[in-house]
């Protein structure tokens, strides 16, 4: 199923769409309106299909967009949001990385790819790949992972990373 909802935060509109079945299968969001959201949704659907995730894209209202928004605003924790994820189609490595990130990097904090890699005994490149493939942005806070040289690398847009961190109270 697909459920989308629009919210206002810090004077901006954020549209959050969630693909769900037994739990959240994927999340996309846009600060730039519906057209950009459609592109992000298409990219997510393609990624989930490649991972063998069975999708129904029938639009139906659900609690999930509001749940994601509540994670963003701090009304509920990332850990609580994580419990709603299906984790379907993820590798064991991705599950390990996402679980660690949710438990260890809190609102208002950032960590480098290298430090995450050291904690998980892997490479910064592997961590970067897992962050890029994250189908659950906001709930799995990939925006809190920054590059040592360029902290603003982020999919879909660097300004989105800055906005999410600002909402969470992070200051450089």
Curated annotation (Swiss-Prot):
One of its GO terms (biological process) is methylation. It is found in: Cytoplasm. Keywords: Cytoplasm, DNA damage, DNA repair, Methyltransferase, Transferase. Its main location: cytoplasm. The active site is at residue 142. GO terms for cellular component: cytoplasm. Its EC number is 2.1.1.63. GO terms for molecular function: methylated-DNA-[protein]-cysteine S-methyltransferase activity. It comes from the Archaea. It catalyses: a 6-O-methyl-2'-deoxyguanosine in DNA + L-cysteinyl-[protein] = S-methyl-L-cysteinyl-[protein] + a 2'-deoxyguanosine in DNA; a 4-O-methyl-thymidine in DNA + L-cysteinyl-[protein] = a thymidine in DNA + S-methyl-L-cysteinyl-[protein]. It is an enzyme of class 2 (transferase). InterPro entries: DNA_protcyst_Mta_Thcoc (IPR054936), MethylDNA_cys_MeTrfase_AS (IPR001497), MethylDNA_cys_MeTrfase_DNA-bd (IPR014048), MethylDNA_cys_MeTrfase_DNAb (IPR036217), MGMT_N (IPR015236), MGMT_N_sf (IPR036631), WH-like_DNA-bd_sf (IPR036388). Involved in the cellular defense against the biological effects of O6-methylguanine (O6-MeG) and O4-methylthymine (O4-MeT) in DNA. Repairs the methylated nucleobase in DNA by stoichiometrically transferring the methyl group to a cysteine residue in the enzyme. This is a suicide reaction: the enzyme is irreversibly inactivated. This enzyme catalyzes only one turnover and therefore is not strictly catalytic. According to one definition, an enzyme is a biocatalyst that acts repeatedly and over many reaction cycles. Belongs to the MGMT family. This is Methylated-DNA--protein-cysteine methyltransferase. The lineage of its organism: Archaea, Methanobacteriati, Methanobacteriota, Thermococci, Thermococcales.
């Amino acid at each position: 199923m697909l459920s989308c909802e629009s919210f206002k935060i810090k004077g901006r509109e954020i549209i959050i769409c969630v693909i769900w079945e037994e739990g959240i299968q994927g999340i996309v969001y846009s600060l730039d309106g519906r057209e950009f959201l459609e592109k992000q949704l298409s990219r997510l659907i393609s990624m989930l299909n490649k991972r063998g995730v069975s999708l129904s894209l029938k639009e139906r209202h659900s609690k999930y967009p509001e749940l994601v928004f509540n994670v963003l605003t701090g009304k509920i924790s990332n850990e609580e949001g994580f419990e709603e994820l299906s984790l379907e189609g993820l590798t064991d490595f991705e599950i390990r990385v996402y679980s660690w990130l949710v438990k260890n990097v809190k609102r208002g904090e950032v960590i480098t790819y290298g430090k995450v890699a050291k904690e998980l005994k892997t490479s910064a490149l592997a961590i970067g790949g897992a962050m890029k493939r994250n189908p659950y942005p906001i709930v799995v806070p990939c925006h809190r992972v920054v590059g040592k040289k360029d902290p603003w690398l982020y999919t879909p847009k660097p300004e989105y990373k800055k906005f999410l961190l600002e909402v969470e109270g992070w200051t450089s």
